Amino acid sequence: MALVLDGRALAKKIEADLLVRVEALKAKSGRTPILATILVGDDGASATYVRMKGNACRRVGMDSLKIELSQETTTEQLLAEIEKLNANPDVHGILLQHPVPAQIDERACFDAISLAKDVDGVTCLGYGRMAMGEAAYGSATPAGIMTILKENNIEIAGKHAVVVGRSAILGKPMAAMLLEANATVTICHSRTQNLAEFVKQADIIVGAVGKAELIQKDWIKPGAVVVDAGFHPRDGGGVGDIQLQGIEDVASAYTPVPGGVGPMTITTLIRQTVEAAEKALA
């Protein structure tokens, strides 16, 4: 029977440790770590995600500062808000909720975030440092996936990892992190021909493509480790990017959907904010 890589249970364990660290930081410095969240526009799903991150802050004893901007906000206005947060010594992490309205240059705004406060790992500078093996906060979802693999003693070095998806905040940093952990990495994407043939070679498969159940169960190599970073609402629940029904009969380990990667994305963001506060208040 396959090992279930339970992200919810691991997130609770990490949050318990973070609560202790935050209390110690408060006792030592008299300050509380603060994550600033910026929500632009009225996207319902984005508002839900921001609320979940605020709840996670409270669970570990942190504060969150919620900045809400109108749908008509310009790039210049958003950059001005980010610069205020960069300059605010009480703010230790900055999250710009993706996506932003179409008129905004999202990349310019991501890159305006101070490296010391880039706890969601979205800046080009942070990505470049991470890809070169230097210290930087990792993009939250792939960094959370790496924690899941390491905490469950999944062997990475020397394994063939196939990442399906090449987005700037998931697929590309995921591949870089696996490479840094000494995996042999293949990146597949929308232009990849014969996708199934690549997936069938994978010791570790990461679904990060954003298409419901694109990766079929019968493509999975027996004994592979299956990581599904997708979520697509369906019939009161949801499915991921990988066809998981019956996967326990094929894989050696897998992340469920929901309850696998998702909880660890938020917990990683919170953990990196605590780390940023510890550095700032040392």
Swiss-Prot record:
GO MF, any single term: methylenetetrahydrofolate dehydrogenase (NADP+) activity
KW Plastid (keyword) present: no
Catalytic activity: (6R)-5,10-methylene-5,6,7,8-tetrahydrofolate + NADP(+) = (6R)-5,10-methenyltetrahydrofolate + NADPH; (6R)-5,10-methenyltetrahydrofolate + H2O = (6R)-10-formyltetrahydrofolate + H(+)
Domain of life assignment: Bacteria
SUPFAM superfamilies: Aminoacid dehydrogenase-like, N-terminal domain, NAD(P)-binding Rossmann-fold domains
Enzyme Commission code: 1.5.1.5, 3.5.4.9
Protein family membership: Belongs to the tetrahydrofolate dehydrogenase/cyclohydrolase family.
Function: Catalyzes the oxidation of 5,10-methylenetetrahydrofolate to 5,10-methenyltetrahydrofolate and then the hydrolysis of 5,10-methenyltetrahydrofolate to 10-formyltetrahydrofolate.
Protein's name according to its UniProt entry: Bifunctional protein FolD 2
Native source organism of the sequence: Acinetobacter baylyi (strain ATCC 33305 / BD413 / ADP1)
Highest classification ranks of the organism: Bacteria, Pseudomonadati, Pseudomonadota, Gammaproteobacteria, Moraxellales
